Amino acid sequence: MFHVSFRYIFGLPPLILVLLPVASSDCDIEGKDGKQYESVLMVSIDQLLDSMKEIGSNCLNNEFNFFKRHICDANKEGMFLFRAARKLRQFLKMNSTGDFDLHLLKVSEGTTILLNCTGQVKGRKPAALGEAQPTKSLEENKSLKEQKKLNDLCFLKRLLQEIKTCWNKILMGTKEH
C-alpha cells in the first residue's frame, strides 16, 4: 500500500509555492546611475561614519538581530535598504548634534525616496520600555544606560556600513549590465 500524505493529496506544497512571493522586492530603485547616491547619500553616510570613528574600538563583535533577519541579498536589496532607512529614523531621537541628525535624516529620507517602494512593510510595535529596578544602585543604572547607548551607537555604525555596502552592490550590478 502506498503511503501518501494528506498534504500531497490536496496539493498543498505546490499551492504554497504559488502563494509565496517571488524573491523580488516591491521597490523600484531609482537613480541606479548613482548620481543622487554619490552626491547626497554617500556624502552624508561618510560624514556620519567619520564622526563615529572612535566608537569602533569599543564595540563588541556581537551579531545584531536586525542583520540576522534582514540581509542585502540578491533581489532583496531594495527591501533591506527600505527597512534600514526606517530603522535609521529611530536614531533621530538620540541626544546628538543637529549636524549629526541632519545627515541621518538625509540618509533615511534620501534612501526612501530613491527606493520608491510601493508595498507597505508591516511595522512592529516598539518594545516596552523597562523600568529601573529599585534594587539597583544609581551607579549600576548609569552604567547600564551608558552600555545601552554604546550598543545603540555600535548598531548604528554597523547599519550605516551595511547601507553603504548595499548601495554599492546595487550600483556595481547596474554598471556591469
Swiss-Prot record:
Function: Hematopoietic cytokine that plays an essential role in the development, expansion, and survival of naive and memory T-cells and B-cells thereby regulating the number of mature lymphocytes and maintaining lymphoid homeostasis. Mechanistically, exerts its biological effects through a receptor composed of IL7RA subunit and the cytokine receptor common subunit gamma/CSF2RG.
Subcellular location, principal: secreted
Family the entry assigns: Belongs to the IL-7/IL-9 family.
Oligomer status and interactors: Interacts with IL7R and CSF2RG.
SS bonds (residue pairs): 27-166, 59-154, 72-117
Disease entry from the Swiss-Prot or TrEMBL record: Immunodeficiency 130 with HPV-related verrucosis: An autosomal recessive immunologic disorder characterized by susceptibility to human papillomavirus (HPV) infections that lead to the development of warts and verrucous or plaque-like skin lesions. There is an increased risk of skin malignancy. Some patients may also suffer from mycobacterial, herpes simplex virus (HSV), or fungal infections. Immunologic workup shows T-cell lymphopenia, particularly affecting CD4+ T cells.
Keyword Glycoprotein: yes
A molecular function (GO) term: cytokine activity
Pfam family, one: IL7
PANTHER family per UniProt: INTERLEUKIN-7
An annotated GO cellular component: extracellular region
Keywords: Cytokine, Disease variant, Disulfide bond, Glycoprotein, Growth factor, Secreted, Signal
Protein name: Interleukin-7
Gene3D superfamilies in the record: 1.20.1250.50
Compartment(s) of residence: Secreted
